[in-house]
Amino acid sequence: MRLHTGEKPYHCFHCDRHFVQVANLRRHLRVHTGERPYSCTLCPSR
């Protein structure tokens, strides 16, 4: 129901972004940490 109410309880401590789902916050935090958990299947890059 948060989607319909506009409630965004999960916020980033590095910037001013807020999220409805904690999974979206975790994905966003990779922007700040530089984490790249998935590797390319065609080359050795991440």
From Swiss-Prot:
GO MF, one annotated term: RNA polymerase II cis-regulatory region sequence-specific DNA binding
Keywords, in A-Z order: Developmental protein, DNA-binding, Gap protein, Metal-binding, Nucleus, Repeat, Zinc, Zinc-finger
Main localisation: nucleus
Statement: the UniProt record of this protein carries the keyword Nucleus: yes
Gene Ontology annotations for the cellular component aspect, listed alphabetically: nucleus
Top-level taxon of origin: Eukaryota
InterPro entries found in the cross-reference section: Znf_C2H2_sf, Znf_C2H2_type
Gene Ontology biological process: segmentation
Location relative to the cell: Nucleus
Gene3D superfamilies: Classic Zinc Finger (3.30.160.60)
Zinc finger boundaries on the chain: C2H2-type: 1-4, 10-32, 38-46
PANTHER family attached to this UniProt entry: C2H2-TYPE DOMAIN-CONTAINING PROTEIN-RELATED, KRUEPPEL-LIKE TRANSCRIPTION FACTOR
Family: Belongs to the krueppel C2H2-type zinc-finger protein family.
Function: Krueppel is a gap class segmentation protein.
Protein's name in the database: Protein krueppel
Source species: Cupiennius salei (American wandering spider)
Taxonomic lineage of the native organism: Eukaryota, Metazoa, Ecdysozoa, Arthropoda, Chelicerata
Gene name of this polypeptide: Kr
